[in-house]
Design a protein with these regions (language model features):
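Extreme N-terminal tail/first-helix region
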Residues: 17, 23-56
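Short, conserved beta-strand element in jelly-roll/cupin
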Residues: 71-75, 85-104, 140-141
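A short glycine-rich, His/Asp/Glu-containing loop-to-beta-strand
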Residues: 43-83, 89-90
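Acidic/histidine-enriched, glycine/proline-rich intrinsically disordered or flexible terminal extensions
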Residues: 152-191
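Ligand-binding loop in jelly-roll beta-barrel domains
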Residues: 65, 121-147
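Short acidic-glycine-tyrosine-enriched beta hairpin
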Residues: 106-124
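Intrinsically disordered, low-complexity segments enriched in serine/proline and basic residues
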Residues: 2-6, 14-16
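Structural motif
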Residues: 53, 92, 99-101, 108, ...
Length: 191
């Protein structure tokens, strides 16, 4: 999915792929030690992971390890991730635009622009674009560290088992087909 449909039609230009993800440290980053600062709508780096994009805004080392902040652009009717849970992090998803569907434990919920969904650690969850227009969410991950999962996934190094062990996650990959059928979603393979 080229640059998540050019950053969901905003014609986003920056690209970060396997070949240049190691240049992340040279990218302009937020640094709390530099004092107050604005992170603009085109700052950060967008990584195209197939079904969902990741725009890195605040890294853990920039927040003293307290949190990381990423933006996920999700194309219409796409599942963002298999059913999964984290053993270390809580996640907060703030819907910027569109309609996000989420399975939180046993509950299916829907969040519109301006809504915040809380996904506590150890709870099975997944999320998707539940609409026919682009969806964008800001994801606050606390404590920080899990943003490195996206970085490594984009580099294409390691196996799913390795990632899950390293980042303290579990994923139910068999849930993908069921979730797509139940909610009319697509989930292209990550390349």
């Amino acid at each position: 999915m080229p640059e998540c449909e050019a950053y969901l039609s905003g014609r986003y230009e920056p690209h970060l792929g396997k070949e240049d993800i190691n240049d992340m440290n040279s990218a302009r980053r937020f640094d709390a030690s530099q004092g107050p600062r604005i992170i603009g709508p085109r700052d950060g780096k967008l990584v195209d992971l197939g079904p969902v994009g990741v725009r890195f805004l605040v890294w853990g080392e920039e927040s003293g390890g307290g949190f990381s902040l990423v933006e996920h652009p999700i194309p219409p009717r796409h599942l963002a991730a298999p059913l999964h849970r984290h053993s270390r992090e809580d996640e907060y998803s703030y819907v910027l635009e569109g309609r996000m569907g989420a399975l939180l434990g046993e509950d299916v919920v829907y969040a519109e622009a301006g809504d915040l969904a809380f996904k506590p650690r150890d709870q099975w969850h997944t999320f998707w674009n539940a609409g026919d227009t682009p969806c964008r969410i800001l994801e606050i991950i606390s404590p920080a560290g899990f943003e490195r999962y996206f970085e490594e996934l984009a580099m294409g190094v390691g196996s799913a088992d390795e990632y899950q062990r390293r980042y303290g996650t579990e994923a139910d990959f068999e849930s993908i087909q069921r979730l797509c059928a139940e909610y009319g979603l697509r989930f292209p393979p990550i390349v």
